[in-house]
C-alpha cells in the first residue's frame, strides 16, 4: 500500500513562501538549486537523487533515481527525469552568474559536478530555509501531534515494562524503538549538526548517561562502540539501584518529536543519594513547567534562557545541562532546528513553532537526571505539550 503523500496545496504554499522569502532576502534573485534530500522532501514531498531548481516563475524537480517513484509519491507539479546535470541546462538554458544553494549541505564535489554543465557562483540561502521550516503549517503540526501521541504512549506507558534485571542498554533502546516503529513511527532521527548521525536514540544507565558525545546534547551515552556513540552498550546491563535515562526520539511522516525521561530501577529510598536525586528531579520538572509557561508568541528565546538559568538551584548549577549552553531547541524535519533557547537568539517566537525543552542535571557518581518534552507555540496562551507531561513515572521496582 503506498504511503500518504504531502498534499499538493501544502507544497504550493511552501513554494510561495520560499519565493517570498527569497525576494525579501534579495529582490534580484533569479535562481536557486537544492540537492539535499531533506530540502527536496520539504518542497516536493519526495526524497530522490536529483536537484530542485526554482526561479521566480518556474520550479522543476529533476530526478536521477527514481523518477517513477517520485512521480508516484509526489504531488509536485513539474517532475522530470535527469540523466546528468546537463538536463537542467536543457530546461533552464540561461543559468545566472549567481545561484543560491544550501551551503551547509552542498559539497565541493557536488558543486564541481554541477559547474561542469552549469557555470555559476554559489551563494548561501541556509537562513531562508531554516526560517521557513521554523514555523509549521497545519499539516506539519498534525504530523507532529501524531508523533507526540505515539511518543507519549511508548515512553510513558510501555517503556517501564521493558525495564528488567539484566537487560542491556542496547537491547532496551532497540525494544523501545521497535515499539515505536511497530506502531507507525518513522524509525530514524535526522539532524542538521555535522557531528550527529541518524540513529535510534539512547538508553544510558547511571554514570554512562554522563559520558559526553560529539552531539551537542546533555544526554550522555557510551554507545555500541567507540565508532557509534548512540543506542547504548550491549555489555552494560540493568541492575537494582541504576538510574535509567531514555532519550529516544519519535517521528511521523518525516516530522520528529523529542522526549526524554529518567527512571530509577529499584527503591529510591535505598540509594545513598536519594535526597539529591529527588531534588534534581523536582528541579527539572519545575524548570520545564516554568519554561513552558514562558513559551509564547512574541517571547524572546535568549530571555527565556537567562530567566531559567537564574532559577537553577546553586547546588545544581555546575551540573546543569551537563555542560551544554542551551535549554531547548526547535524541532521538525530535523531534531536540531532553529530557534534555540540559548544566548544570541533574539528573534521573537511565533505561533506554529515547535520546541523541545530538556532541563537536565548531571550528578557525579549517579547519572543524568531530567526530563524533556516537545511543545507547540500557540497563537494565544502558553505552549502546549505534544508529548505528555514531565511529571511521569519515575521509580520502577525490580521485576
Language-model features: where?
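Active-site neighborhoods and metal-handling regions in enzymes and metal-associated proteins
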Residues: 1-399
Amino acid at each position: 500500500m503506498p504511503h500518504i503523500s504531502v498534499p499538493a496545496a501544502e507544497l504550493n504554499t511552501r513554494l510561495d513562501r520560499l519565493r517570498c522569502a527569497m525576494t525579501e532576502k534579495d529582490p534580484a534573485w533569479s535562481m536557486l538549486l537544492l540537492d539535499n534530500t531533506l530540502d527536496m522532501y520539504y518542497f516536493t514531498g519526495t526524497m530522490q537523487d536529483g536537484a530542485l531548481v526554482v526561479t521566480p516563475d518556474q520550479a522543476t524537480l529533476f530526478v536521477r533515481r527514481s523518477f517513477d517513484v517520485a512521480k508516484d509519491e509526489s504531488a509536485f507539479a513539474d517532475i522530470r527525469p535527469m540523466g546528468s546535470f546537463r538536463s537542467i541546462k536543457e530546461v533552464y538554458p540561461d543559468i545566472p552568474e549567481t545561484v543560491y544553494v544550501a551551503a551547509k549541505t552542498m559539497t565541493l564535489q557536488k558543486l564541481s559536478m554541477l559547474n561542469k554543465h552549469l557555470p555559476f557562483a554559489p551563494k548561501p540561502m541556509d537562513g531562508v530555509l531554516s526560517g521557513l521550516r521554523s514555523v509549521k503549517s497545519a499539516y506539519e503540526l498534525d504530523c507532529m501531534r501524531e508523533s507526540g501521541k505515539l511518543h507519549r504512549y511508548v515512553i510513558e506507558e510501555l517503556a517501564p515494562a521493558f525495564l528488567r534485571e539484566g537487560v542491556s542498554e542496547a537491547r532496551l533502546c532497540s525494544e523501545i524503538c521497535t515499539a515505536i516503529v511497530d506502531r507507525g513511527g518513522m524509525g530514524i532521527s535526522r539532524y542538521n549538526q555535522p557531528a550527529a548521525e541518524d540513529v535510534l536514540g539512547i538508553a544510558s544507565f547511571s554514570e554512562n548517561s554522563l559520558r559526553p558525545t560529539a552531539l551537542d546534547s546533555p544526554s550522555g551515552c557510551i554507545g555500541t562502540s567507540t565508532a557509534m556513540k548512540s543506542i547504548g552498550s550491549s555489555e552494560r546491563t540493568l541492575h537494582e539501584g541504576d538510574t535509567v535515562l531514555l532519550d529516544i526520539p519519535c517521528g511521523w511522516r518525516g516530522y520528529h518529536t523529542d522526549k526524554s525521561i529518567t527512571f530509577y530501577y529499584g527503591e529510591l529510598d535505598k540509594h545513598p543519594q536519594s535526597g539529591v536525586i529527588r531534588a534534581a528531579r523536582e528541579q527539572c520538572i519545575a524548570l520545564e513547567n516554568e519554561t513552558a509557561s514562558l513559551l509564547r508568541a512574541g517571547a524572546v528565546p535568549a530571555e527565556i534562557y537567562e530567566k531559567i538559568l537564574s532559577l537553577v538551584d546553586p547546588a545544581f548549577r555546575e551540573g546543569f545541562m551537563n555542560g551544554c549552553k542551551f535549554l531547548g531547541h526547535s524541532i521538525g524535519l530535523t531534531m536540531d532546528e532553529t530557534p534555540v533557547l540559548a544566548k544570541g537568539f533574539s528573534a521573537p517566537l511565533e505561533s506554529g513553532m515547535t520546541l523541545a525543552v530538556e532541563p537536565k542535571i548531571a550528578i557525579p557518581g549517579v547519572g543524568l537526571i531530567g526530563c524533556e518534552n516537545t511543545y507547540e507555540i500557540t497563537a494565544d496562551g502558553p505552549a502546549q505539550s505534544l508529548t505528555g507531561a514531565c511529571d511521569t513515572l519515575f521509580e520502577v521496582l525490580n521485576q
